[in-house]
């Protein structure tokens, strides 16, 4: 493996002038270069509709990575090239192929090509098919296709898109990116579970009461309103990011730590999810939309007052739900999920609540005890907190809650890789473990479609939670009726 730690490839970015490329892709490639994870045998070709030059792209790259801190920035950006492009014109692909061949000769790259689609999804199928038909993927090295979400709008559209792409690329060449799978603590879920004897035997319905996943954002829709109006929180967050976390939390131990075995176990979880019938949606799921309020003391508008949002919009900006997994390990254990915009804070965390001990001798009027909790902090802080009960200081045998903390990103000297940095490097190495397989995508869409169809038919949603809160009251009621509550810790 060490001989391949500096992969040699040309990275072609479709949508090179866009926001994702500037915010995430260019800084991530730069960090890989700085850290020696890619050497000098690489090139990046940015394609887009704008009539840019190589220098225009290089200046954009410098701006996006705060280049003043890197004295080698010109060496880095010299690897970047721009190619004006029309995705519907076969001639553009032929010209691109000529450029790629030239760059592979210049940088001694063995015909390895990574195509990153960071643009509007309606062009994904066209690009994939034309790359093949014009011979851009016909190389002696490898060709890989990286696809950003959304992968379809529902199961039928996802199936149609997958069929188009599979005409040009095989499944093992397709890397469907979910940046949550690149986050360090999401990847740490498997290690916490399978490398610790104090957790692995307890990770069942015998000892776990419930699992809660919260992914909250304090921002509103910002400049994504046009996309969000078609998507909503269910499609934007639940179908991909949250379903992936559920699968990692619930999967059986894989036979080996390789791509095929891990994906296989995740697929089994998604197959075991209890489907939500349309007449049960209101029992298991809650939706919300933010109205005006304050975030950190600053007034913010309601969703329907945001730019490019219809004043009578029925789009949900909040989702909470109860998921049940019908298998031997998890029967009877609810997985509660919630995600939303304009909430109290930006935070993603997982809370595993363990069951109480039968006839606990320390429950009583003098004791303020909580159940044992394992909290996995995904962002912005990355770490683990374990909540236990211990004896109070003093003579009486009274107990009190205590916590044990580990923070993985609190050390300023530790340069934690960004999610995109890790995923781009994984793709260059051919490691698809942290990318979504088609089976996972299809099963996730199959689960959420009945919910989205029910909500689409019932256009009664109105703003029902204040900006700066943790969501609508109905979200709390979802747990209260089960004798539980959200752990806001």
From Swiss-Prot:
Q: Read off the PROSITE patterns from this record.
A: G6P_DEHYDROGENASE (PS00069)
Write out the similarity annotation.
Answer: Belongs to the glucose-6-phosphate dehydrogenase family.
Residues annotated as binding NADP(+) are 15-22, 49, 86-87, 149
Q: Set out the biological process GO terms recorded for this chain's protein.
A: glucose metabolic process; pentose-phosphate shunt, oxidative branch
Cysteines joined through disulfide linkages:
none
Which ranges of the sequence are coiled-coil? none
TM segments? Answer: none
Task: Give the UniProt entry's GO cellular component terms.
Answer: cytosol
Name this polypeptide is given: Glucose-6-phosphate 1-dehydrogenase
InterPro entries annotated for this entry?
A: G6P_DH, G6P_DH_AS, G6P_DH_C, G6P_DH_NAD-bd, NAD(P)-bd_dom_sf
Q: Which UniProt keywords apply?
A: Carbohydrate metabolism, Glucose metabolism, NADP, Oxidoreductase
One function term, GO molecular function aspect? glucose-6-phosphate dehydrogenase activity
EC top class named in words: oxidoreductase
Its gene name is zwf
